[in-house]
Swiss-Prot record:
Residues involved in Ca(2+) 3 binding: 141, 143, 145, 147, 152
Signal peptide positions (record): none
A Gene Ontology term for the protein's cellular component: cardiac Troponin complex
Domain EF-hand: 16-51, 52-87, 92-127, 128-161
Classification via Gene3D superfamilies: EF-hand
Protein name: Troponin C, slow skeletal and cardiac muscles
Known function: Troponin is the central regulatory protein of striated muscle contraction. Tn consists of three components: Tn-I which is the inhibitor of actomyosin ATPase, Tn-T which contains the binding site for tropomyosin and Tn-C. The binding of calcium to Tn-C abolishes the inhibitory action of Tn on actin filaments.
Remaining remarks: Slow skeletal muscle Tn-C can bind 3 calcium ions per molecule. Domain I does not bind calcium.
UniProt organism field: Gallus gallus
């Protein structure tokens, strides 16, 4: 595994690490070894705004799965996310983020409320607890008004890019 990616992990903010950990934890629930299967990995990365192709995903897994377990622990996952962030260059464009915001904002009122967030996260097909959803809402809702406006959404997405 490239040391450059390991070094880049050290540059992640605590907030970025916490957001990655929250997404990782959603998928690791019930796993006895604290790792997620490579199958689940694509879902986690998509949830965090990354969209690797199956080939890119396999290539990343081959690089970070140092112990050959076929699963990815959190440290390996962080290295993967950093690599994906670097490969993604500047991340999502403003237009892509605007489209994503509109997908979440089902009633088109300019805000993402808890119910809209829950609907979108449950659409991933994974079992997500109310606590997980509320934690994500809390992370995104900087002014604590119970909903995420577009500026808060952009700020939140910067953290996951």
């Amino acid at each position: 595994m490239d040391d450059i990616y390991k070094a880049a992990v050290e540059q992640l903010t605590e907030e970025q690490k916490n957001e990655f950990k929250a997404a990782f934890d959603i998928f690791v629930l019930g796993a006895e070894d604290g790792c997620i299967s490579t199958k689940e990995l694509g879902k986690v990365m998509r949830m965090l705004g990354q969209n690797p192709t199956p080939e890119e995903l396999q290539e990343m897994i081959d690089e970070v799965d140092e112990d050959g377990s076929g699963t990815v622990d959190f440290d390996e996952f962080l290295v993967m996310m950093v690599r994906c962030m670097k490969d993604d260059s500047k991340g999502k464009t403003e237009e892509e983020l605007s489209d994503l915001f509109r997908m979440f904002d089902k009633n088109a009122d300019g805000y993402i409320d808890l119910e809209e967030l829950k609907i979108m996260l449950q659409a991933t097909g994974e079992t997500i607890t109310e606590d997980d959803i509320e934690e994500l809402m809390k992370d995104g809702d900087k002014n604590n008004d119970g909903r995420i406006d577009y500026d808060e959404f952009l700020e939140f997405m910067k953290g996951v890019e």
